[in-house]
């Protein structure tokens, strides 16, 4: 029995760390979350998501978040003559931990996508214990036009990579900020240094191809300075 309790305790602690990181990620992207949601204690996590025998229940680990006013402003295209009141390119996000511990196939992904689409979620993040099958990944690609779906492994969320002392602060630029940057330095976007969309930081921020991120570093000699990268 002790061995079983110890296994449950380790799994619960791992899931709690992933739960905290995914909340920090969603908050850092600009969604509204209460401080107590982001900084939930391990005891509160156990009370909310563990069964009577101490085992964690991934099926209860889910939440949604709405974009903040600043996020809506950043993701709203500038008005044009043909579209004087453009809609923002963001909306409510749905996050869910997949209860399946085996292979994540088409049926699991279709169910998740249908839930997001039916409930009008603009984006969805599925956190899984194991990697997706190639067929499940194809479902994500097909649905990207109307619901942006992302997947993260639990093990990749045990530590928030942006909290590492060697990782500089990354800030997504709005369309207007990107255009102003290119105009100021008389550059084409293809002349900017690049960051791959599969880069861990790009995935953390949910960067899309064509977006520009500002990287703020501090140097003992140069002080605080910024560089820019285009997501490709």
Give the location of each predicted region.
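Helix-rich terminal scaffold detector
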Residues: 1-122, 134-142, 155-161, 167, ...
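Long beta-strand-rich cores associated with HINT superfamily self-processing modules
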Residues: 160, 168-173, 177, 181, ...
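Short, structured beta-strand/loop micro-motifs enriched in basic residues and often containing a Trp
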Residues: 188-199
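Short, surface-exposed secondary-structure boundary micro-motifs
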Residues: 217-218
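Short, compositionally biased
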Residues: 223-232
